[in-house]
């Protein structure tokens, strides 16, 4: 029998794994308010209505609306890790649902304070925002 390929710990949240990072994690002037603040995630270029994928297995903690982030979905994963997907146009799962890595969970949009459609991906470890590109590197 053939050995099974190892499943990566995390996958990219968009089907286009080469999507451009249009706004990195870190302190910067907010593109809408112009005030300096921590950009607590990364913005990934995506057309309106692009499929958003769960980066890993988890439970949908919340699907809600926030004035700044617009429609935002939060997944809870193992080891105190949460992922947040913001500025969505549509939720495809409900709070409490179990999701699998790669499952389509939402559609990108431009809800909240944005300059256009994209996906804002945030990662929290034990409630603290960290750089998603570092935190979600597959080992």
Region spans (language model):
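Surface-exposed, glycine-biased beta-strand/turn segments
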Residues: 2-69
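Conserved, short, structured surface segments that act as functional micro-motifs
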Residues: 21, 71-76, 97-139
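Residue-level recognition of beta-strand microenvironments
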Residues: 24, 63-64, 91, 108-111
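Intrinsically disordered, low-complexity acidic/polar segments
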Residues: 30, 84, 130-132
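Zn2+-dependent peptidoglycan hydrolase active-site motif and core
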Residues: 37-39, 54-92, 117-118
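Active-site acidic-Proline motif in GNAT/NAT acetyltransferases
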Residues: 46, 90-91, 95
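Short acidic/polar mixed-charge low-complexity motifs
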Residues: 50, 79-81, 128
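Short, well-structured beta-strand-loop connectors
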Residues: 51-61, 93-108
């Amino acid at each position: 029998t053939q050995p099974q390929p190892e499943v990566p710990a995390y996958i990219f949240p968009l089907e286009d794994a080469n999507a451009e990072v249009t706004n990195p994690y870190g302190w910067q002037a907010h593109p809408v308010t112009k005030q300096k603040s921590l950009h607590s995630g990364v913005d990934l270029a995506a057309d309106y209505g692009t499929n958003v994928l769960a980066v890993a297995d988890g439970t949908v903690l919340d699907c809600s609306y926030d004035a700044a982030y617009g429609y935002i979905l939060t997944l809870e994963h193992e080891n105190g890790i949460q992922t947040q997907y913001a500025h969505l146009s549509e939720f495809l799962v409900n709070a409490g649902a179990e999701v699998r890595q790669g499952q389509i969970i939402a559609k990108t949009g431009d809800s909240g304070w944005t300059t256009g459609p994209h996906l804002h991906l945030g990662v929290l470890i034990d409630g603290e925002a960290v750089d998603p590109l570092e935190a979600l590197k597959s080992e």
